[in-house]
């Protein structure tokens, strides 16, 4: 599923960014761009934690494959931009068209071609790679136990009368358990779970009562926060019910704490694509659950009956995340 979701997320983000359908779900022609992103991210992930490795181009010697991949992706972006610039600006409402209209509030200058290239490349890498990881994680967790799968499938199938009804709106928003499954998957397997370093401003600051001098870099890994017993009961167990509770006697929900929950980071540099990512996952899994019965390929009759799976979807930190699997079987469901 990791490869399938890579293709799907790439197709969605390139369509949103450039109003272009590369259809990598069905055709292999442009899948090299996905491989280039994956290979290039290995180097970037290391440099994020150890930027000194870039001195005298040491990283080029350590990661030759990543360097080749970088130029392949740059070449792809230039090709896409050339086609997009040749198209009429007025006919598209993609991200690229909005970037073309951006102007510096002080100078009034528009973005240069190089700046447009950088911004759109960032949208594709950040949007496609993280979304595909999130969807792969959700598919792993909801197929990990009969309890979870049956409940989320029943919620979707009882909410919509046909697959054509599945779209953004009140009905989809009412699928609270599906949203809880997504939130819990993002807690256990955040697509960007490493430490995102920030430099302390001149003069220093107090962090939780400890003075940190200016120009020091500080960070805490999102993965470690999400797995802290200080915030979550049984932090290594997949339990979507921690995000979903029936109304209690006082009419309020009892939910897990939101403040330490940060799969999209926090603050002014948090992910601007969060609403798009959540909407994308809600629609994708609502449609999959309505159309198909899903099982893991190694499905057995003792399928974690009545329990949630404690097996974590493993990720490797490559700037965003490298993943593999799960392997699932799909069969068209018998509709009433």
From Swiss-Prot:
Homology family: Belongs to the cytochrome P450 family.
Record gene name: lcsN
Cofactor(s) needed for function: heme
Description of what induces expression: Expression is positively regulated by the leucinostatins biosynthesis cluster-specific transcription regulator lcsF.
UniProt lineage: Eukaryota, Fungi, Dikarya, Ascomycota, Pezizomycotina
Official protein name in the record: Cytochrome P450 monooxygenase lcsN
Signal peptide: none
A GO term, aspect molecular function: heme binding
Pathway assigned in UniProt: Secondary metabolite biosynthesis
Record: residues binding heme: 271
Organism whose genome encodes this protein: Purpureocillium lilacinum
Keyword terms: Heme, Iron, Metal-binding, Monooxygenase, Oxidoreductase
Annotated EC: 1.-.-.-
Function: Cytochrome P450 monooxygenase; part of the gene cluster that mediates the biosynthesis of the lipopeptide antibiotics leucinostatins that show extensive biological activities, including antimalarial, antiviral, antibacterial, antifungal, and antitumor activities, as well as phytotoxic.
């Amino acid at each position: 599923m990791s490869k399938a979701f890579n293709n799907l997320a790439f197709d969605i983000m390139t369509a949103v960014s450039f109003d272009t359908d590369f259809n990598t779900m069905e055709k292999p022609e442009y899948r090299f761009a996905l491989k280039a992103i994956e290979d290039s991210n290995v180097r970037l992930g290391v440099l994020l934690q150890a930027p000194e490795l870039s001195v005298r181009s040491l990283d080029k010697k350590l990661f030759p494959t990543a360097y080749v991949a970088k130029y392949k992706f740059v070449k792809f972006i230039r090709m896409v931009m050339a086609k997009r610039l040749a198209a009429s600006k007025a006919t598209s409402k993609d991200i690229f068209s909005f970037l073309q209209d951006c102007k510096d509030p002080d100078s009034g200058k528009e973005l240069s071609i190089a700046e447009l290239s950088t911004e759109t490349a960032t949208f594709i890498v950040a949007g496609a790679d993280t979304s595909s990881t999130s969807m792969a994680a959700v598919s792993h967790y909801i197929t990990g136990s009969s309890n979870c799968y049956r409940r989320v499938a029943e919620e979707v199938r009882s909410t919509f009368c046909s697959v054509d009804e599945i779209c953004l709106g009140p009905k989809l928003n009412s699928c609270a358990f599906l949203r809880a499954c997504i939130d819990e998957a993002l807690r256990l397997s955040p697509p960007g779970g490493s430490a995102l370093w920030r430099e302390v401003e001149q003069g220093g600051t107090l962090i939780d009562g400890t003075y940190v001098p200016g120009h020091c870099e500080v960070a805490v890994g999102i993965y470690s926060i999400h797995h802290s017993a200080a915030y979550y009961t049984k932090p290594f167990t997949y339990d979507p019910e921690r995000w979903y509770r029936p109304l209690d006697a006082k009419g309020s929900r009892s939910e897990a704490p939101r403040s330490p929950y940060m799969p999209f980071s926090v603050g002014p540099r948090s992910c601007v694509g969060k609403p798009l990512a959540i909407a994308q996952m809600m629609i994708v899994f609502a449609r999959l659950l309505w159309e198909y019965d899903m099982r893991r390929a190694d499905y057995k009759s003792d399928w974690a009956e009545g329990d949630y799976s404690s097996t974590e979807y493993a990720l490797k930190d490559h700037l965003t995340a490298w993943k593999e699997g799960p392997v699932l079987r799909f069969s068209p469901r018998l509709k009433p």
